[in-house]
């Protein structure tokens, strides 16, 4: 059952990233009523939404009712921090999530369910839309940031006057 309903947890996280909830809480931890106003959350589902994020350990709720990011969430899902890796989650939410909804059709027909459906070039579709391209580039840069930081710290740069950053989308290295 847990696996069959796992999309509930996934979509809860993806919606929180989309709304920039973690970025807002990094600036100002708050109680439910304050978050409803600041984030535009409807009273009907706000508490359940936030408490689901607490149960999944993305948020903490103190005895005073104040919601705040966990240390990991604060580090990786606050859009204002250079350590933000949520770009891949933004792309998963906007671009990939819907494709997975067509998995049964893909398995039965063998047809791609993404932009390559019908023989089209998926990258041509991404490059044709500036907003989708920015999202894709942010996703690729964010997901490679940890490795880039390690390379930057460990590579013996002293013997080189220039280099080309070819695989990290936005020149993150």
Language-model features: locations:
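Conserved beta-strand/loop positions that form the S-adenosyl-L-methionine
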Residues: 166
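Conserved SAM/SAH-binding loop
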Residues: 169-170
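Conserved Class I S-adenosyl-L-methionine-dependent methyltransferase catalytic core
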Residues: 1-162
């Amino acid at each position: 059952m847990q696996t069959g309903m796992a999309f509930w947890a996934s979509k809860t996280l993806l919606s929180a990233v989309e709304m920039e909830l973690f970025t807002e809480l990094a600036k100002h931890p708050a109680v439910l009523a304050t978050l409803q106003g600041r984030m535009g959350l409807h009273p009907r589902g706000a508490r359940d939404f936030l408490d689901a994020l607490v149960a999944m350990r993305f948020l903490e709720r103190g005895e005073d009712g104040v919601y705040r990011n966990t240390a990991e969430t604060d580090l990786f899902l606050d859009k204002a921090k250079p350590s933000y890796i949520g770009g891949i989650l933004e792309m998963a939410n906007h671009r990939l999530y819907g494709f997975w909804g067509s998995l049964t059709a893909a398995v039965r027909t063998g047809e791609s369910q993404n932009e390559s459906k019908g023989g089209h070039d998926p990258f041509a579709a991404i490059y044709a839309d500036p907003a989708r391209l920015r999202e894709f580039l942010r996703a690729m840069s964010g997901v490679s940031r940890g490795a880039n930081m390690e390379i930057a710290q460990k590579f013996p740069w002293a013997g080189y006057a220039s280099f080309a950053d070819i695989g990290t989308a936005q020149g993150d290295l």
